[in-house]
């Protein structure tokens, strides 16, 4: 009953904002009839992106989160809708102070007074999934306490079940649905949002990222206090910084904006290629700038619920793809897509090369500083999808992160030339990958595994030799079978030739006899003779009959 009432509310909001107009035009007849009542509602004087954004906000935090996810999929969602969904606000009414305190005490097994020297009952922030308060530990360290909103898991499960039903219907009943894979999008959302409900997972991500950038001038990650962290409660160091979007404050302290923008790019490539562990939710709300050293500014990152990593093969192919693309070597881009397995092996390299050239050439006619690096990557993947490229979740995360970093960098410093930072980094990374030191590191890394398998080598060699011997014994039989097959093929060809000769002979006989054959038939009863039929026709008929008898 609750699910039915929720569905009614969703339909009412969809009708109010006429979201039926966002659906594909080629809907089945039943669906078209079902949506007819929507046309009774007036047309809102809003763009389609605004209508979708407001509908998400009216439907609550789960749909807000889903809209935010859609804003990270410009490969599937039109650009004007992506732009509007980026403005979705994830601010919701805080849950009760008493409830917050009860959850903390229940999870930590102690009263707030026993764990904290002071505790601010007013929330610092309240979002759809969690709420944050500030506190001070007994030893004087300032912390923030993040608590999962009570009962949110049931709300999420209910709304996702409804979204999945709609997605399956759209995918099964529309051509656009089959192309856009809405079920896959909702499943991706379900994985993402349920990961966000596990604060120990987020804490582990934060610890890893902090270790990767420990003592780095580029990025600071606050410390997690594991002794006070549980699945639904996270306690970590409180940071003080300037929101990265507060340009007035950054300029007031004379921050080197060019360096700040370039360091953002450097952080991205360091995470993706050197650490192979990247913060995949680097939107402006999760990034701050330290007050110290404005001439060499340092970023501060929070909220590590979503992270990504690539396989070593994907790292390698991505680096080579980016370098080839900016050299305008479209042939190599196409070859790398096939070689990496991103597109099926049956795809013609020449066709993919032509498609990539068509998309990229207009972009590269601009000055480098005006080129959107993320947009190039997006166009590349969008083109590859036309050639059956499977959706790679980690590459989608990376693309989304790059869009955020580049957009932020251009906001800080409009003349940012991302390629000037990326090119030497990628060249250096590829060179180091095959450096003797790197190869030695790989050898040491896999040596224990190889040593463990070494005792099996004699058996593997023996089995291999045994198989070769079996192949040797099989060879004469294969040769014999080949000869038999060839003989059968030759016999079949001879039979076919005879059939053709037979047909031609009879056809020739009939053709030669035709002028007098009719006369012979007319006098059949009286003469029982075909004396008027030309002799050549008898000869051809005899040849045909002989060939037919021989083939039997």
Swiss-Prot record:
Cellular location(s): Cell inner membrane
Cellular component annotations (GO), alphabetically ordered: plasma membrane
GO biological processes: regulation of ubiquinone biosynthetic process; ubiquinone biosynthetic process
Pathway: Cofactor biosynthesis; ubiquinone biosynthesis [regulation]
Keyword entries, A-Z: ATP-binding, Cell inner membrane, Cell membrane, Kinase, Membrane, Nucleotide-binding, Transferase, Transmembrane, Transmembrane helix, Ubiquinone biosynthesis
Residues holding ATP: 124-132, 146
GO MF: ATP binding; protein kinase activity
Protein kinase domain mapped to chain residues: 118-498
Keyword Cell membrane: yes
EC number of the protein: 2.7.-.-
Membrane spanning residue stretches: 22-42, 501-521, 530-550
Lineage top rank: taxon: Bacteria
Disulfide topology: none
Pfam family, one: ABC1
Active site: 281
Membrane-topology annotation of the record: Multi-pass membrane protein
Described function: Is probably a protein kinase regulator of UbiI activity which is involved in aerobic coenzyme Q (ubiquinone) biosynthesis.
Name of the protein in question: Probable protein kinase UbiB
Lineage: Bacteria, Pseudomonadati, Pseudomonadota, Gammaproteobacteria, Cellvibrionales
Name of encoding gene: ubiB
């Amino acid at each position: 009953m609750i699910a039915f009432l929720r569905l009614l509310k969703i339909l009412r909001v969809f009708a109010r904002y006429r979201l039926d107009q966002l659906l594909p035009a080629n809907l089945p007849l039943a669906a078209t009839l079902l949506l007819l009542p929507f046309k009774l509602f007036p047309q809102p004087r809003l763009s389609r992106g605004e209508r979708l954004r407001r509908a998400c906000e009216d439907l609550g935090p789960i749909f807000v989160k889903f809209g935010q996810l859609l804003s990270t999929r410009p490969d599937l969602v039109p650009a004007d809708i992506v732009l509007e969904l980026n403005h979705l606000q994830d601010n919701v009414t805080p849950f009760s102070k008493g409830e917050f305190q009860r959850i903390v005490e229940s999870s930590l097994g102690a009263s707030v007074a026993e764990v904290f020297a002071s505790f601010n009952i007013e929330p610092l922030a309240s979002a759809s999934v969690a709420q944050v308060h500030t506190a001070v530990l007994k030893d004087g360290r300032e912390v923030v306490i993040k608590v999962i909103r009570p009962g949110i898991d049931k709300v999420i499960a209910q709304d996702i079940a409804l979204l999945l039903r709609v997605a399956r219907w759209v995918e099964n009943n529309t051509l656009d649905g089959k192309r856009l894979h809405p079920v896959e999008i909702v499943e991706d959302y379900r994985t993402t949002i349920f990961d966000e409900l596990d604060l120990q997972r987020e804490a582990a991500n934060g610890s890893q990222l902090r270790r990767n950038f420990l003592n780095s001038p580029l990025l600071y990650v606050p410390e997690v206090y594991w002794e006070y962290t549980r699945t639904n409660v996270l306690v970590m160091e409180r940071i003080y910084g300037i929101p990265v979007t507060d340009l007035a404050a950054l300029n007031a302290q004379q921050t080197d904006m060019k360096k700040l923008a370039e360091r953002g790019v450097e952080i991205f490539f360091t995470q993706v290629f050197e650490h192979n562990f990247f913060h995949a939710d680097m939107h402006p709300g999760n990034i701050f700038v330290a007050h110290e050293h404005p001439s060499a500014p340092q970023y501060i990152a929070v909220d590590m619920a979503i992270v990504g990593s690539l396989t070593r093969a994907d790292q390698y192919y991505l680096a080579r793809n980016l370098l080839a693309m900016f050299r305008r070597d479209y042939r190599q881009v196409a070859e790398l897509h096939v070689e990496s397995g991103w597109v099926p092996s049956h795809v013609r390299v020449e066709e993919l090369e032509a498609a990539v050239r068509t998309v990229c050439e207009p972009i590269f006619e601009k000055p480098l500083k005006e080129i959107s690096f993320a947009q190039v990557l997006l166009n590349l993947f969008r083109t590859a999808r036309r050639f059956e490229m499977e959706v790679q979740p980690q590459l989608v995360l990376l693309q989304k992160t790059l869009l955020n970093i580049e957009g932020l960098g251009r906001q800080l410093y409009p003349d940012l030339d991302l390629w000037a930072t990326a090119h030497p980094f990628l060249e250096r990374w590829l060179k180091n990958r095959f450096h003797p030191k790197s190869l030695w590191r790989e050898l040491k890394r896999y040596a224990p595994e190889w040593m463990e398998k070494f005792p099996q080598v004699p058996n593997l060699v023996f089995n291999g030799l045994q198989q070769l011997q079996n192949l040797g014994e099989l060879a004469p039989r294969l040769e014999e079978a080949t000869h038999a097959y060839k003989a059968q093929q030759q016999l079949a060809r001879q039979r076919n030739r005879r059939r053709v000769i037979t047909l031609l002979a009879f056809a020739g006989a009939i053709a030669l006899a035709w002028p007098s054959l009719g006369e012979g038939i007319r006098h059949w009863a009286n003469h029982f003779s075909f004396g008027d039929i030309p002799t050549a026709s008898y000869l051809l008929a005899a040849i045909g009959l002989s060939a037919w008898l021989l083939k039997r």
